[in-house]
Amino acid sequence: ENIEILNRYHGVRVRNLKTGIRYAAIIHLNGNFTIGTYESDIEAAIAYNKAIDILIKKGVSRNFTPNYIESLSPSAYADIYSEVSVSRKILDYRPI
């Protein structure tokens, strides 16, 4: 099989920096908003999910597709979810 999965998770992009590989979580609202940059794709995927939750609570009505991380137990997911940071732009976002 010649299939290589480049982006396993919605809203996660790989960044090759001088300091190494990092993962950016980005969500599209009225343009792209960077949620944050993380050490792992799983952290970035969970940050994307957290941003979705925040935006829905703020009244944004979009059909965002959340990420499902099969490799984590619910408690491990919850631990990362509670610790992962989300950019101030998402926290302060006001729907139009």
What is the role of each PLM region?
Residues 1-96:
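Boundary-flanking segments of nucleic-acid-binding domains in nuclear regulatory proteins
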